[in-house]
Amino acid sequence: MNKLNLINKFIFLFKHRGFILNVFFFLVVLTFLCPSFPLVFSNPVSQPLLIRFEDVTEKAGLRFRHNNGAFGMKYLPETMGSGLAFLDYNNDDWQDILLINGKNWPNRKKSQSSMALYRNNKDGTFKDVTKQVGLHSTIYGMGCAIGDYDNDGWVDIYITALGLDHLFRNNGSGRFIDITKESGLHNPDFGASAAWFDYDLDGDIDLIVTNYVQWTIKNDIHCSLDGINKSYCTPESYKGVSSRLFQNVGNGTFLDVTDESGLFDSTSKALGVAVLDSNA
């Protein structure tokens, strides 16, 4: 190609530069918009890891069976389950399991049931140590709260129950002692849930206990769906009962401060409780 031809081509491109730029711009835009021209700007996103859970109850050695005492009378508490907690009761840095249980109703001749404490064997299995630690008690339990109320470094257990709640102190030697009476924690109602928290910021934990309804065997109501056969009643059939707040005095005893704290509510029918600082 001679020099004259090169000059002519340059003159042609210069005269038509607007058209050429427009075509170039169109191709760039088309590249971004047209799905047939995919652009990869980063590495492909890897597939999320699929996590699955396996039922290892039997393999872990957990042989617990819940007993609600039902025998055909259709009492309201039979409709409830019961709570559990993970706790390190022996301070070995392994989580143990506490399972709350119900019991048979009075005058029923079946074998009685108890809550169960399973100690972590540190190999994926657990051992039932309920009797060994002093927790083999026939309580119609509902829930539990774990906390070190006496600040001795060992977690203690509070159990909400039908009829009377219980406080078990961890003595640090592998045993729990029922100190309900001497502690001043008297809740004879339909205890449902509980939570430890330091409401007065004095360095020791206090206790809030939620109660459900006013129910006993004596005041059980006959509810029916067909007008003949008894069915389980709903909570609307019963009166409410206030939850309670117990202040930790600091000497191993508690004081009921429900009224002065403003938490008294006789219409309450509480099953759960959550503690938080909502205006921090």
What are these regions (language model features)?
Residues 1, 33-280:
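Acidic, glycine/proline-rich Ca2+-coordinating loop motifs
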Residues 1-17:
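N-terminal secretory signal peptides that target proteins for export/translocation
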Residues 4, 23-27, 47:
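Low-complexity, intrinsically disordered regions enriched in charged/polar residues
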Residues 22-36:
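Bacterial N-terminal signal peptides
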